[in-house]
């Protein structure tokens, strides 16, 4: 069983929803990312999602676009992020790590080489925003060999037939996009998200995690009862952008994640975490 599957099983046994924070790898620097990953875990993260910076992150809003620019300016490359994960794994062999990126990044390295290097570093899952399952044959083959889960997005307007097709080849968990638009978009409707998650669950036993538009503890808490995981990105990336030079950035990030964790637990476990 993969680290991702183990973690979701543990969360389910504990009666809590998995918290999946996202940060952009290399922002403000690759060295900082190692420290920030440990801070996320200290705050209660169950899975960590790392964005691989790209010069044209079309699915991302201005906050993450700016983070990608900062990371690239700091010299971040996929190879340096693999080293970040290796260093993280020296102290944390258990927390699942998912890379989120764009097809051009993987194509530049070669699908097989990228997956092989990711697995060797300790990456558990890959989410390629702009690579549909029909075009992921070589990537899927190598991911299967290396034991890396391929995670796919399901949008609110995805047809039932398409949802079933995506779920049939997905691994790890299904990423349910809670809003149309880019990351960091505005208001969520928890009722509609709950219906979306229920539709996905009708065709797969994989955990369903919800992201896009989760901005604060209140919105995370609202979604926690209807999903297996809640993904929070832009709010944390914004904090890193505002306080990147602060010596206490890891503590600030830890406390922000802890607030999310407590709010979610209050709605799913009665506050017992």
Curated annotation (Swiss-Prot):
CDD domains: Tryptophan_synthase_alpha. It comes from the Bacteria. The active site is at 49 (proton acceptor), 60 (proton acceptor). Keywords: Amino-acid biosynthesis, Aromatic amino acid biosynthesis, Lyase, Tryptophan biosynthesis. Coiled coil: none annotated. It holds the Pfam family Trp_syntA. The keyword Cell inner membrane does not apply. Its EC number is 4.2.1.20. InterPro entries: Aldolase_TIM (IPR013785), RibuloseP-bd_barrel (IPR011060), Trp_synthase_alpha_AS (IPR018204), Trp_synthase_suA (IPR002028). GO terms for molecular function: tryptophan synthase activity. It catalyses: (1S,2R)-1-C-(indol-3-yl)glycerol 3-phosphate + L-serine = D-glyceraldehyde 3-phosphate + L-tryptophan + H2O. GO terms for cellular component: cytosol. The keyword Lyase applies. Belongs to the TrpA family. Tetramer of two alpha and two beta chains. The alpha subunit is responsible for the aldol cleavage of indoleglycerol phosphate to indole and glyceraldehyde 3-phosphate. This is Tryptophan synthase alpha chain. It comes from Halorhodospira halophila (strain DSM 244 / SL1) (Ectothiorhodospira halophila (strain DSM 244 / SL1)).
